[in-house]
From Swiss-Prot:
Subcellular localization, as worded in the UniProt entry: Secreted
Signal peptide: 1-36
Cross-referenced InterPro entries: Peptidase_S1_PA (IPR009003), Peptidase_S1_PA_chymotrypsin (IPR043504), Peptidase_S1B (IPR008256), Peptidase_S1B_tx (IPR008353), Trypsin_dom (IPR001254), V8_his_AS (IPR028301)
Pfam family, any one: Trypsin
Keywords linked to the UniProt accession: Hydrolase, Protease, Secreted, Serine protease, Signal
Annotated family: Belongs to the peptidase S1B family.
Transmembrane segments: none
Name of protein: Serine protease SplB
Gene Ontology MF terms: serine-type endopeptidase activity
Record lineage: Bacteria, Bacillati, Bacillota, Bacilli, Bacillales
Function of the protein: Serine protease that cleaves specifically after the sequence Trp-Glu-Leu-Gln.
Length: 240
């Protein structure tokens, strides 16, 4: 795929933050009838890896990349500020890994939809392993790479409010990897923005940000592929 396709297609993509208002109904109707590979599993236990690496915003998803540090999309973090809260791997009304306050937001300087968020180490509301963020979550490690045909999974909180913060895992094949773009055929919905894109070993290959708004067999989902430059930016902004 030409690396410009994703950029030029933004007008026809769903930016996958759960929102209310104009456009939401259209997106939901399209996604309910999508023909993209629809291998979606409801996660029963979020207190085991890889699910302990995922966090929920009120309208989107993020994941842990290091000490007190999570990753999401710029189009997610722009709606948040220092002092706002995130919840570690909630499992609807069955508990969570604690609630934490945002202390710093750092956006990637390039065009890629990547944002680092640091949180306060001590929880506002404790998780099952106490008040320390790092005791209640598990950071992801990077994959060596990814290529077309490999299987990936996207883990996140589609329609988090509507679905009462139930975690879902969607799987499918990689369609292409070029530059900082990874394209895959996996069913995603509003709220999946910021979800980790993982290989079969639960290693990070990218971060999810959008999907096509169309109803045919070629409907794809899009992520930012973790290039060395993006990995370097993330490493430099892990909380010390």
């Amino acid at each position: 795929m030409n690396k410009n396709v994703v950029i030029k297609s933004l007008a026809t993509l769903t930016i996958l933050t759960s929102v209310t208002g104009i456009g939401t109904t259209l997106v939901e109707e399209v996604q309910q009838t999508a023909k993209a590979e629809n291998n979606v599993t409801k996660i029963q236990d979020t207190n085991i890896f890889p699910y302990t690496g995922v966090v929920a915003f009120k309208s989107a998803t993020g994941f842990v990349v290091g000490k007190n540090t999570i990753l999401t999309n710029k189009h997610v973090s722009k709606n948040y500020k220092v002092g706002d809260r995130i919840t570690a791997h909630p499992n609807s009304d069955k508990g969570n890994g604690g609630i934490y306050s945002i202390k710093k937001i750092i956006n990637y300087p390039g065009k890629e939809d990547v944002s680092v968020i640091q949180v306060e180490e001590r929880a506002i509301e404790r998780g099952p392993k106490g008040f320390n963020f790092n005791d209640n979550v598990t950071p992801f490690k990077y994959a060596a790479g990814a290529k077309a045909g490999e299987r990936i999974k996207v883990i996140g909180y589609p329609h988090p409010y509507k679905n009462k913060y139930v975690l879902y895992e969607s799987t499918g094949p990689v369609m292409s990897v070029e530059g900082s773009s990874i394209v895959y055929s996996a069913h995603t919905e509003s709220g999946n923005s910021g979800s980790p894109v993982l290989n079969s070993n639960n290693e990070l290959v990218g971060i999810h940000f959008a999907s096509d708004v169309k109803n045919d067999d070629n409907r794809n989902a899009y992520g930012v592929y973790f290039t060395p430059e993006i990995k370097k930016f993330i490493a430099e902004n892990i909380d010390k």
